[in-house]
Amino acid sequence: MSDAFPEMTVGAGTVLTTDQAQKAVWCGAQFIVSPGLNPKVVSWCIDRNIPVIPGIATPTELEAALDLGLTTVKFFPAEAFGGLKTLKAISAPYGNVRFMPTGGIHPENLNNYLSFLKIFACGGSWMVP
């Protein structure tokens, strides 16, 4: 895809292992997104200068991401964990962290999420039926 559309930034999502990350990058992925925080995947990406956005749902997981040097994370599954209200509460002590919520995001709640300044993007399967 990245060869066919060189102006497009292409990433790989739902990456669970370093083997999957390696294959995705070999296929042209320029960044990696994971549903959870796998330190091996994060370290593999950091060691290769590949942007990585792992999933977190709790302050403990966010602290682990910060310990790995990350300041950009995915909040997943957003709606199942309380949505924007929970994200605002979790993010309050972490002024330098930016979030990409996914999971339960849809056209009706998208603008509410995007109005929160700590959110840089939202994801959802509804975007690609």
Language model segments and positions:
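Catalytic beta/alpha-barrel core
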Residues: 8-16, 29-37, 51-58, 62, ...
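Glycine-rich phosphate-binding active-site loops on the catalytic face of alpha/beta enzymes
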Residues: 31, 35-41, 74-84, 118-129
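Short, glycine/charged-rich beta-strand-loop motifs at protein surfaces that mediate ligand recognition
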Residues: 76-77, 97-104, 109
